A protein has these predicted regions:
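C-terminal outer-membrane/trafficking sorting elements
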Residues: 16, 871-956
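Conserved alpha/beta catalytic core and glycan-binding cleft of carbohydrate-active enzymes
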Residues: 541, 574-718, 722, 774, ...
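Residue-level detector of functionally pivotal "anchor" positions at catalytic/ligand-binding pockets or at interdomain
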Residues: 150, 783, 787-789, 862-883, ...
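Basic K/R-rich, polyanion-interacting modules in nucleoproteins and related proteins
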Residues: 228-269, 322-383
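Substrate-binding/active-site clefts of carbohydrate-active enzymes
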Residues: 330-331, 336, 367-544, 549-568, ...
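Aromatic-rich carbohydrate-binding modules that target alpha-glucans
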Residues: 57-113, 188, 250-253, 258-306, ...
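C-terminal beta-strand-rich structural cap/linker in extracellular carbohydrate-active enzymes
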Residues: 844-867, 936
């Protein structure tokens, strides 16, 4: 994969699919050049491998590094999925399947954008127009005078015994004077200008070596460096008890830190960092744990409390990596751009000069965040209303602070959970977040860890849970646990996983692979995932995870085998159950949501897992197409009956249904571009389409069970998911190569959608529907019916376990293009109320049709909906509900609120006290043992400081 391309991310993001890489040969004329000169690069390409044997359409993707080591894209690249024609290579000829192509730059400086600093290096690769196939990275030095160190390898660490002679050799393009230095002291000076260096150096000490080549004609200097170190035995010692893999702080001693890394097949590991001037030294050679020899550890002492230090591990084979369990990572590729336009990350530590690759940050005695909410009562899984958002596109400021400033907007919508697209350290700063390199660290692009904690804290103060989307199916090539065991054909420090990599498959074991595929059967991978889950739950108090691409958690299939990947796989079932247990071990009430979109039989294995304990995994339930068919006005494919959990074979409400997600086209966009249009009624009209989105909410949000909304659906967001930054639309299937799916999208706030009257009316309607849904116990039921498929859907919801008078709800909608008389089939006659405004109707016949305008809806209840103040009073009252009734298997699952200092008492039907139980929290779920109770009816009484609640229990 493209290392420096990941580093830039200035204009584009790599689409999340595998990119085929082909090795090509090349030459440049002249061989050495200044930035003011013209050059011609010749490429020899296997045209069959690139798929261009007939089209000969290949393009240059280029970037440069200036004298300040700042990277920048070539201005004529275009986007990764749609190359600029300016960068098209000139086809010369073909022979034996190998095509010869050239590209001429009039001047190197102008081609790379006339950068203000002199160019140090230029880089390029050859690609197809849509980026599906690419060459390796090609890197060239700029300047007529060049010096190449041929031995040892530049930047290498050479561990040898004392007295070993190393031949230091190199060549220059022009006559030069050479000086070799050890720890800054010259040990060799050439007697005359020459183009070759050959000096035998006897190693007697650890030394930082420099070879300085000075152009005899003009004094231009080129310096190359490497390190020599005397070998010493690796000490074996038991790792201290306070340490584990990663960075461990000793609460009793803020002047030291423990570092430990799992490094099988590595002969030794050094720690290099700001505390030892980044030098390889015997004093920083890590020890082997006596119990686990593959675990290396070292204590760093003499640190100043609260001072920031940076470090890397350097393995015996010269690979430098940050700690995979870093909580803060500094990047030479991404960090220069974080605070360019705003102070997104105040006091961002500077990347250490002279280093390369990511580095870890350590800081002892760092002040802890003072949480306002320490024991958040999560909304019940069955009542979750999840708001999925991408920080990058939600506000114009794209920061945690800007999200904090919008809490009132979210709270007023009545949602009770936000689901953030991945915020773990990803490559670049402009991304959906699924290109994760460091799963343990928070990405810096949106702000500091403290500000992220504040966002979570504020959400909890407002009754909103926080769920993180997490991509544990894969990791990018920047990941330390990928780079430590890699095949590096270019010697640039990046490459694909090697056969001995303990974490990754060399070839993916499923057909949806992106980046590097984790081997989830590996004990090393399982430990890594376990630690990642623990970090986010304990450190940030997140309420759960949405697991991305769970179809990839198998070892049973081949990379291109769709059929196998989509079938039931027992190893995948077992692996993910194991991970669920890990997550629940840290927080038994933690939400687990899988994006699987697989067979019902496999999904039911997780949805029904430990359901008797009130657990069970929630499964993404895509209902985009049927709901969109309704909103557009087409009856074909409009049946959304699978919005019901039981249609999937789940025993409880564990289907997180959605009409929109980050991955699906926006309903409003399709309404406006493809909606039905007939005389007198046009779905493509904005006002008409916005009204239909109200009806969509009525037959979507009222269905019992968890639901998910994609950001700004409540405002009728109508920009295509394929909208480009310039406002055009480029899809995966249109004639323009590539697509703009991953491009940044405008914020609805920036478009003033939130102040537009028609859109605000839609928002208010959604908020009202959600208020009815969440304040009425009638919706906390498993007894409901969904009828759809004819553009006049009907929902029938019933709950006789609630103490509220509202026990029946009937929802009707008309998605046709004309007024319809819809038979309500009320369950009984009498007074029925439109819950949107509590207007009363006297129903004398349950089958008398209700006249509903096109795009309209009605939500009827047998009793009034609670007014807001009544709902608030209800929320402050004691409540007690059995989540499963009748009860069996010796356990009663209950849910209660306002139970501070409360106790439960179970009575039989005659009023005899059977047992008492002290509740463990103020609000939440609890399981009570009823072993020994005979079949029959009982009462459970909850008594607390706020009052008393009673529920009827039937034991089978």
């Amino acid at each position: 994969m493209m290392k420096y391309f990941y580093a830039l991310f200035l204009a584009v993001i790599l689409p999340f699919f595998a990119v085929a890489q082909q090795v090509i040969t090349y030459s440049v004329s002249p061989v050495s050049f200044d930035e003011s000169e013209a050059i011609t690069v010749t490429f020899n390409v296997n045209e069959t491998a690139f798929g261009t044997a007939s089209s000969h359409a290949l393009y240059l993707w280029a970037w440069s590094i200036d004298s300040a080591t700042v990277l920048q894209d070539c201005p004529t690249n275009g986007t990764w999925t749609a190359s600029n024609p300016v960068n098209k290579l000139t086809y010369v000829s073909s022979s034996g399947g190998i095509g010869t192509y050239t590209y001429t730059m009039n001047t190197v400086k102008s081609f790379y954008g006339n950068r203000s600093n002199p160019l140090s290096k230029i880089a390029m690769l050859v690609k197809t127009i849509n980026g599906s196939v690419q060459s390796q990275d090609i890197l060239m030095n700029v300047g007529k005078f060049q010096f190449n160190l041929t031995n040892p390898v530049e930047g290498s660490t050479n561990v040898v015994t004392s007295g070993t002679v190393i031949n230091i050799t190199g060549t220059s393009t022009l006559p030069a004077n050479f000086v070799v230095k050890a720890n800054g002291t010259p040990v060799y000076t050439s007697s005359a200008a020459t183009t070759t260096l050959n000096y035998p150096y006897s190693v007697t000490q650890d030394a930082a070596m420099e070879v300085v080549a000075t152009n005899a004609a003009d004094g231009t200097v080129v310096t190359k460096s490497f390190t020599v170190a005397l070998s010493i035995p690796v000490q074996s010692a038991a790792i201290p008890s306070y340490m584990k893999q990663g960075i461990s702080y000793d609460s009793a001693d803020p002047t030291k830190v423990g570092l430990a890394i799992y490094a099988p097949s590595k002969a030794y590991v050094h720690v290099i960092g700001s505390f030892n001037n980044w030098a390889v030294s015997a004093n920083y050679l890590m020890k082997r744990d006596t119990t686990n020899p593959d675990l290396y550890w070292l204590e760093i002492t003499g640190l100043t409390p609260q001072q920031i230090y940076t470090f890397q591990y350097r393995t015996a084979d010269g690979i430098k990596v940050a700690d995979p369990y870093s909580t803060l990572v500094l990047s030479p590729y991404d960090d220069p751009y974080i605070n360019q336009n705003a102070n997104v990350y105040p006091n961002l530590p500077a990347y250490p000069t002279g280093q390369n690759f990511e580095v870890s940050v350590i800081q002892t005695a760092k002040p802890a965040y003072n949480w306002n909410v320490t024991n958040f009562a999560k909304p019940a899984k069955e009542n979750l209303i999840v708001y999925e958002l991408l920080v990058r596109d939600f506000t114009t400021q794209k920061t945690w602070q800007s999200l904090i400033d919008k809490i009132s907007y979210l709270k007023s919508l009545k949602i009770n959970a936000v689901e953030l697209m991945p915020v773990m350290e990803f490559d670049g700063n402009n991304s959906w977040g699924y290109n994760t390199g460091f799963h343990y660290a928070l990405d810096k692009a949106y702000g500091t860890p403290e500000k992220f904690k504040e966002f979570i804290d504020v959400c909890h103060q407002n009754g909103i849970a926080v769920i993180l989307d997490i991509a544990l199916n894969h990791a990018t090539g920047r990941s330390p646990i990928e780079r430590m065991w890699m095949v590096d054909p270019n010697g640039d420090g990046f490459g694909d996983p090697a056969a001995n990599n303990p974490y990754f498959n060399q070839i993916a074991k499923h057909s949806y692979s992106v980046f590097n595929d984790f081997n989830h059967s590996s004990a090393a991978t399982k430990y890594y995932v376990n630690r990642v889950l623990e970090q986010w739950i304990k450190e940030y108090k997140v309420d759960g995870f949405r697991w991305d691409l769970t179809k990839g958690f198998t070892q049973a299939c081949a990379a291109g085998d769709d059929a196998c990947t989509n079938q039931y796989q027992q190893d995948r079932v077992n692996i993910l159950k194991g991970y669920a247990d890990y997550q629940w071990s840290y927080d038994p009430s933690s939400y687990i949501i899988f994006e699987h979109l697989g067979t019902d039989s496999e999904e039911a294995q997780w949805a029904n897992y430990k359901i008797g304990e009130g657990k069970g995994v929630m499964m993404w339930d895509k209902q985009t197409n049927p709901y969109n068919q309704n909103t557009m006005g087409y009856d074909t494919g409009s049946n959304f009956n699978r919005v019901k959990y039981s249609a999937h074979g789940f025993s409880e409400r564990r289907a997180v249904s959605y009409g929109e997600s980050h991955d699906e086209e926006r309903l409003m966009y399709k309404n406006l571009t493809s909606g039905v249009s007939v005389a007198g009624y046009n779905v493509k009209d904005l006002a008409t389409s916005l009204e239909r989105q109200k009806a969509y909410a009525a037959v979507f949000l009222t269905v019992p069970g968890p639901k998910m909304i994609w950001q700004f659906a409540e405002l009728g967001f109508d920009k295509s998911i394929y909208t480009c930054e310039n406002g055009t639309v480029n899809t995966e299937t249109d004639s323009t190569p590539g697509d703009c799916k991953l491009d940044p999208k405008p914020s609805a706030f920036g478009l003033n959608y939130d102040t537009n009257a028609a859109r605000k009316s839609l928002y208010d309607t959604w908020a009202k529907i959600l208020e009815i849904r969440l304040s009425s116990d009638v919706f906390n039921t498993k007894t409901f019916t969904v009828e759809s498929g004819n553009l006049m859907p009907r929902l029938f919801i019933f709950n006789n376990t609630t103490s509220s008078a509202l026990k029946n709800v009937v929802v009707l909608a008309n998605f046709t293009s004309s007024t319809q008389n819809i038979v309500p089939d009320f369950p009984y006659t009498g007074s029925w109320y439109n819950l949107m405004d509590n207007t009363q109707s006297n129903v004398t016949s349950t089958t008398t049709p209700i006249t509903i305008e096109p795009g309209g809806f009605r939500i009827f209840g047998n009793s009034k909906a609670l007014a807001t103040n009544e709902a608030n009073q209800s929320k402050n009252a004691v409540s007690l509900v059995l989540t499963q009734n009748p009860v069996s298997n010796g356990t009663a699952s209950i849910r209660y609120t306002n139970a501070k200092n409360g106790s439960l008492a179970i009575y039989d039907f005659s009023g005899t006290l059977i047992k008492t139980v002290q509740v463990s929290k103020d609000n939440g779920d609890e399981n009570i043992s009823i072993n020994g109770l005979k079949t029959g009816m009982y009462f459970i009484q909850l008594k607390s400081e706020k009052g008393i609640a009673v529920a009827k229990m039937i034991v089978k």
